[in-house]
Amino acid sequence: KKYLEDHPLIKECCPEQSLFVNPIFNLQRYAPGEGFKKWHCDWTIGNEATEPVNRVLAWILYCNDVNSGGTEFHWQNHHEIAERGKLIIFPAGISHIHRGRVNNNEVKTIATGWINAGKLENYISRLANS
């Protein structure tokens, strides 16, 4: 809600849309040498109740500092450094294909989640009925 208030152009351009932060998120702990090394984007086409098909934005919260860790964005040729408390938000689609950078000496812990188009009430109702 606050995001839409802070970015009124979204409602102006897409008045039929609303956004909600998906209450389901992932907490991931990678041992040294582990990580999500495969290039990917965060949109989904699944029909599972816990995975709405309308992911708009993705977010990553870095839970610790990791030297040379972080997230690499392919098309942007950009590496976001993993710093404790840093939150990054980016488009979930193919414009922001990304992967985790692996550190062979340190543990990396992140939380990841999504901001979806639609209404939270409808999503919760769908979860309750599945």
Predicted regions and their residues:
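Fe(II)/2-oxoglutarate oxygenase catalytic core
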Residues: 1-87, 95-130
